[in-house]
Structures are given as structure tokens and as C-alpha cells.
From Swiss-Prot:
InterPro entries: Prenylated_rab_accept_PRA1 (IPR004895)
Residue ranges crossing the lipid bilayer per the database entry: 54-71, 75-92, 104-121, 125-147
Principal cellular location given in the protein's record: membrane
Topological type in the membrane: Multi-pass membrane protein
Subcellular location field: Membrane
Single GO cellular component term: membrane
Organism of this sequence: Encephalitozoon cuniculi (strain GB-M1)
Keyword Phosphoprotein (UniProt): no
Lineage: Eukaryota, Fungi, Fungi incertae sedis, Microsporidia, Unikaryonidae
PANTHER family: PRENYLATED RAB ACCEPTOR 1-RELATED (PTHR19317), PRENYLATED RAB ACCEPTOR PROTEIN 1 (PTHR19317:SF0)
Keywords: Membrane, Transmembrane, Transmembrane helix
UniProt protein name: Uncharacterized membrane protein ECU02_1470
């Protein structure tokens, strides 16, 4: 139980840091800092530094794109419901007809439900994978191109 409370406090602190520092948000949207990396090592360094510094912004961008796509393809709400029901049943272990559901049974039922969903709604899943790939490409491109000002952070 202690671990859960500690994780919640850490999560809240991270959210406050991400939202409280206006310089980070300004740096994220500052197109004046965009420049092509000199070599592959410079690109890797930038990507790792920017992914660490702007993780909340990249996560928010991905969540917004995904939410827009879910609103466009409403059948994905069924998938969200299947996953949510599976997580709930796995954690709570409800009783159905005087039989307690085991985690193994819940995982198998969830897998079968998701598989059936994939069979009937192929286009929605392909679109979701395309959105994921697009977000990954945009994130890595932004992280690799955003360069100036990183030297100040590295020296501190």
C-alpha cells in the first residue's frame, strides 16, 4: 500500500513540475531553437535529453491525437471498454455465479475479446497503429531537431 501512495505523490509532483515551469512549455514550442543535428551522436543526445525534458508534452500530444481518432472512430470505445473491464476483473476478482474469476481466466477472456474486436474492426486498429506511428515520428523528429539551449542544461 505504501508503494501506491508514494507513486501517487511522485506522479502529482511530476505533473506540477510539468505544468508549473512555463519555460519548459515555451522551449517546447520555440521554433527558433530548431536546427539540424551535426551527427548521429548529437541527434541521439538531443533525443534523449528532449524526451526526458518534454515527456509530459509528448505524452499530451499523443493523447490528444489518439482522443481525436477515437472520437472519429467510435467503435474504439468498445475496445476501451474491453480493456477497462479486463483490468477491473483482474484487480477485483469478481464472483460470477458463485465462482471467483481467476486472473488467468480474465486474461484469456480479455485476449479473446480483443481478438474478436480485431477481426470485426480491422480499419480502426490499422488507423490506431498509424496514429501511433505518426506520433512516434513527430516526437522523434521534434526531439532530434530541437537543439539550442541544451548546452545550458548540460553544464548545470
Amino acid at each position: 500500500m505504501q508503494g501506491g501512495i508514494q507513486e501517487e505523490k511522485t506522479f502529482q509532483r511530476n505533473i506540477k513540475e510539468a505544468l508549473g515551469d512555463k519555460d519548459v512549455t515555451r522551449d517546447f514550442f520555440n521554433i527558433g531553437r530548431i536546427c539540424v543535428p551535426q551527427n548521429l551522436n548529437d541527434a541521439k543526445r538531443r533525443v534523449f535529453a528532449n524526451l526526458d525534458r518534454f515527456k509530459f508534452h509528448y505524452l499530451a500530444m499523443t493523447a490528444i491525437f489518439t482522443l481525436i481518432y477515437v472520437l472519429y472512430r467510435l467503435e474504439l470505445i468498445i475496445l476501451i471498454g474491453i480493456v477497462a473491464a479486463g483490468v477491473y476483473a483482474y484487480r477485483v476478482r469478481p464472483t460470477v455465479c458463485n465462482i471467483e474469476l481467476e486472473p488467468r481466466s480474465v486474461c484469456i477472456a480479455g485476449f479473446v475479446g480483443i481478438l474478436i474486436f480485431f477481426i470485426f474492426f480491422k480499419e480502426a486498429i490499422v488507423g490506431l497503429l498509424a496514429i501511433s506511428a505518426l506520433c512516434g515520428i513527430v516526437t522523434l523528429t521534434h526531439a532530434a531537431l530541437l537543439g539550442e539551449g541544451l548546452q545550458k542544461d548540460d553544464e548545470v
